[in-house]
Amino acid sequence: MKRSMYAGHVRKEHIGRTIVLKGWVSRRRDLGGLIFIDLRDREGVMQLVINPEDVSGDVMATAERLRSEYVIEVEGSVEARQQANDKLATGAVELKVSGLTILNTAKTTPFEIKDGVEVSDDTRLRYRYLDLRRPEMLESFKLRAKTTHVIRNYLDNLGFIDVETPMLTKSTPEGARDYLVPSRISQGHFYALPQSPQITKQLLMNAGFDRYYQIVKCFRDEDLRGDRQPEFTQVDLETSFLSEQEIQDIVEGMIAKVMKDTKGIEVKLPFPRMAYDDAMNHYGSDKPDTRFDMFLQDLTDLVKEIDFKVFSEAQAVKAIVVKGHADRYSRKDIDKLTEFAKQFGAKGLAWLKVADGAFTGPIAKFLTGVESKLTESLQLEHNDLVLFVADTLEVANNTLGALRTRIAKELDMIDMSQFNFLWVVDWPMFEWSEEEERYMSAHHPFTLPTAESAHELEGDLAKVRAVAYDIVLNGYELGGGSLRINQKDMQERMFRALGFTAEEANEQFGFLLEAMEYGFPPHGGLAIGLDRLVMLLAGKDNIREVIAFPKNNKASDPMTQAPSLVSEKQLEELQLQIEHHD
């Protein structure tokens, strides 16, 4: 029989109609000779009533066989419920069953199919098809579909062209590790799965496409955390002849449209802009969460002359003030914060508490001479807790930035209903890699340096600034973009600054350098992490919750057992051998 509608769509206006529904048995209850079934489908739950006085013996026998997650087809008439259930959208009605067919049976599931069930992440991923039956999971994917629909319509209306770029590309040395794909035809050679369509979308600008977009899969072989996956989806944009501001205006309009159409929230435009240095110095992060204060304070000069070498000899001494919560943190709690601080390179964590106008704590005795200045500078009051880090400026900023976020979560200081967008601009072009012992691109090597700092490509690389911009939401980097290099000589200078020889640059990027000899227009763009955006819209804290079949923290899939061994025959065809090292 043809399904009349979704179970979750049945309402009062359908009373008196005979309909056919199909779905899963969510729950069965036997009460006073009647059998009650909660039928679940994609759109919700509907109560079925099976009365032995109204159905044949066969139907009743079938009903008695029903168990959770059986797939069934039912026919019956919609009636008003004697006692409405306000918790259900269908709670005013029920279906009086006249016909029932079991379409498939089900084993006892490894966990109950309902929201809020306690089950391990690996079990959820092992039985992902069951996990996805839960209503909150379905809602997340409806939200994701709505988000991509809004984005496509918005960009289509602005004249952007949706173009698919290759999945098998050339491996490049910058950035994260590539996922490599061996070529059977060109043996000994490898493709790479794209970390982004960066170069190909730039080449589309050279081709005259003017405005490109793509909702595209990307791949990075990197260590995983809550907001990262080895394969992820991004909203990729590129434009020709537009300024940094014009590109940001387009992106802001897109985000505003998504927020209005998916959440019913009007966001204020334009988004605030914050310089990279200000973000690091005041928030300790290049992706600051501006929903709460607790700013980093620089005390380096104030404590320079005190008799406490940890402070007086440090490159930087910075602090955060936890207002009015000193009594919430015992010595044991502060020890935990100290261990947390060490994860970010800090040697330790100094602290003091303010009680009735006096300082208490291990370092209080060293601060006697600057107590009044410190109180005034930090605007200290009774029951304040002050946490200090004395180290390099980078370590102090990073450590206190992480502590700031951790403490705000512990103390419920964050308004979770807020969506605070901002742009982080004025980025450094390069960042120093301790591991590589060289400067590397802060974004990528195709980013345009500012006209004022480009001369430092042959001088002090720390002084080179980029025409780059990141969009940030609630402490998460949603995406990043920049104006790109379109002149061959500038691109060659960039490669030299990164340590490429002319031969290496030509081997890796010769096709791009050649393209720059054929009228490459000024261009720029941006990419936004779709998974991360939907995660935040859905109020989740892990992008696995908005990816249908994600990997676990070991980059493996407990359901399919990927990655897996392959046969010797497959390896022979590729002329590959696996060496095992103890």
Swiss-Prot record:
Pfam families attached to this UniProt entry: GAD, tRNA-synt_2, tRNA_anti-codon
Annotated coiled-coil segments of the chain: none
Catalytic reactions on record: tRNA(Asp) + L-aspartate + ATP = L-aspartyl-tRNA(Asp) + AMP + diphosphate
Record-listed ATP binding positions: 220-222, 229, 477, 529-532
UniProt EC number: 6.1.1.12
Alphabetic keyword roster: Aminoacyl-tRNA synthetase, ATP-binding, Cytoplasm, Ligase, Nucleotide-binding, Protein biosynthesis
GO biological process, one term: aspartyl-tRNA aminoacylation
GO terms for cellular component: cytoplasm
Location(s) in or outside the cell: Cytoplasm
Subunit structure: Homodimer.
Name used for this protein in its record: Aspartate--tRNA ligase
Organism from which the protein derives: Streptococcus equi subsp. zooepidemicus (strain H70)
